[in-house]
């Protein structure tokens, strides 16, 4: 995994330099550097095992309802759809529940869409435990390695969605989550907020009413609705957590505080 991370970070740096010095496109190299630091610190946390919910998949698999052998294309196809479904709802909740948004907002904090945006994921995501959304699949009987492998494959697909120079993909736009769909997802324009949550598929967005197509008549603005202008990785990582803490402290009564924490951002 370390080799994969090094390769991805090298691609991030190469794209940033190409954009700035060859393609002559505006590129914030300080923002790219902040994203690289974010990724390296998060990798350090991964090595330390800083996840409150890390034991969950092993516990669920030990008490699984069945044993599903991944020996057929059908088994892999079913698991792929279930992983995509779980990812869709987890991603949607990270936009609609402020506690989750406090971590996920880091990913949206870059004011441009470049490959560096793909590795800016913050340092607190594991404390919330996205793994909880995929653990039910392990409990059903799918091997944890198969589940985590498909999740990782989806994240690798999404890495390339952050390249704003990639063209539209024709008929594939109906089924797959594409760079065009992801540009909409990262936009802060009112017309584009809270949409296109899929991993590698866009079909669940179409089914559940969260799909928004890219429009040629709207100039995209990337980043948060209240932009983060700092290049300090620590400020970027905890910007929304501090805002959440201020709002919780200002709320009157425990019910109001719960609404602040678990209501929409």
Regions found by a protein language model. Give the residues of each.
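Alpha-helical membrane-anchoring segments
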Residues: 16, 42-58, 231-234
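Juxtamembrane/interfacial segments at transmembrane-helix boundaries in multi-pass membrane proteins
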Residues: 52-77
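Hydrophobic transmembrane alpha-helical segments in integral membrane proteins
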Residues: 1-9
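Membrane-embedded catalytic scaffold of the fatty acid hydroxylase/desaturase
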Residues: 41-49, 70-222, 227
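Cytosolic-facing loops and C-terminal tails of multi-pass membrane proteins
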Residues: 218-265
